[in-house]
């Protein structure tokens, strides 16, 4: 789970660290830089998965950048199979059932770490399945344009 940097460290300078705060920073399954910071708190590396843990909880993205994680997101190490599985869980309403909060819905660390994903033992099989669903996602995106 992320940890927000001090507000005085936020910037508009792309040479600073990209700050991912939540759903607003995830577009079409990818981190879309919008805010920067000079302070590193918790980080995610290129290729990591990013999950929004605040409303709407469960929205997924990938990062093509090294980023700083704010409080509204969690960084997850995983491959395309894990990404596609988490996207499916979100579309099935899994995270919505676990979300709680008085001001806005959010999910906690236990909800994320205790989620059960059936993962094939064979990494090649994981990659094949993940890539297959990624291809379908790309095809759908193409037809929606």
Feature annotation, model-predicted:
Residues 1-119:
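DNA target-recognition domains and sequence-specific DNA-contacting regions of bacterial/archaeal
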Residues 116-145:
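Amphipathic alpha-helical segments
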């Amino acid at each position: 789970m992320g940890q927000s940097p001090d507000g005085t460290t936020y910037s508009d300078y792309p040479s600073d660290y990209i700050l991912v705060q939540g759903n607003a920073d995830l577009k079409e399954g990818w981190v879309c830089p919008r805010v920067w910071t000079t302070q590193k708190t918790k980080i995610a590396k290129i290729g990591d998965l990013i999950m929004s843990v605040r409303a709407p909880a469960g929205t997924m993205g990938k990062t093509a950048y090294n980023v700083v994680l704010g409080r509204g997101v969690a960084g997850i190490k995983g491959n395309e199979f894990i990404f596609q599985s988490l996207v499916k869980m979100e579309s099935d309403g899994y995270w919505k059932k676990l979300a709680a909060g008085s001001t806005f819905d959010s999910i906690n660390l236990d909800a994320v770490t205790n989620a059960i994903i059936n993962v094939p033992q064979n990494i090649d099989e994981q990659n094949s399945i993940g890539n297959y669903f990624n291809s379908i996602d790309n095809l759908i995106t193409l037809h929606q344009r």
